Structures are given as structure tokens and as C-alpha cells.
Amino acid sequence: MKKALRYIDAHLSDELRLEDVAAHVYLSPYYFSKLFKKYQGIGFNAWVNRQRMASAKEMLCHSDWSIASIARNLGFSQTSYFCKVFRQTYQVTPQVFRLQNNANYDGD
């Protein structure tokens, strides 16, 4: 599983498909999916989105990239979908998160 997780982390900006990661670790997609959920506690797509959202938070805090650029850099073809996933994950839009975060840094 570690090899699969390293592959996912190295390819967050790519279109990550379960089938491709399974092939990378020489497992069938079905078996890989079952093992992944067993060991990670969540499904493959949820894990990928969780990793991407963690990276998005870092980029929003520590870069001046546009939200669209961050979305593209994390493998999202549509900025609107990126914003939707971010909001579902953190209950705030990327723009509001960035504004709140910058306000916190300005006060230090």
C-alpha cells in the first residue's frame, strides 16, 4: 500500500484513476479498491480528494497563485468542481479560506 500512496502523492496533479494506480502496484482494480479501503479506511477517490485538499490549503496559504491555477495544478479540470470539493471539505470557499488565513498572518 505504501507504494500506491507514494504514487498518488507524486501524481496529485495528474488525472488519477484507480485502474492506473492498481496497475502500478500489480493488482486488479477490484482487489486494489478493496485493499485500499481496508487499510486507509476510506475509498480511493475520497483519499485522493483529501490529499488534494490538504495541498490546496498549503497553496492557498503560501502562494499567490490564482484559485484556478491551484485547481489545475491539483488535477482538477474545472475550477468550479475544485471549489465545490474544497467547500464540502472545509465548509468555506477557497477564496474565503485565503482571506481568513491572510488576516491571521497579518495579525502576527
Regions picked out by a protein language model, each given a short descriptive name:
Residues 25-29:
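Histidine/lysine/aspartate-rich catalytic loop segments that bind and position anionic ligands
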Residues 22-23, 36:
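Short linear motifs at secondary-structure transitions and domain/linker junctions
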Residues 3-6, 10-19, 38-80, 99-108:
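Terminal helix-turn-helix DNA-binding modules in bacterial transcription factors
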Residues 31-32, 36, 81-82, 86:
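Short hydrophobic/aromatic patch on the recognition helix
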Residues 24, 73-74, 89:
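Residues within the alpha-helical elements of helix-turn-helix
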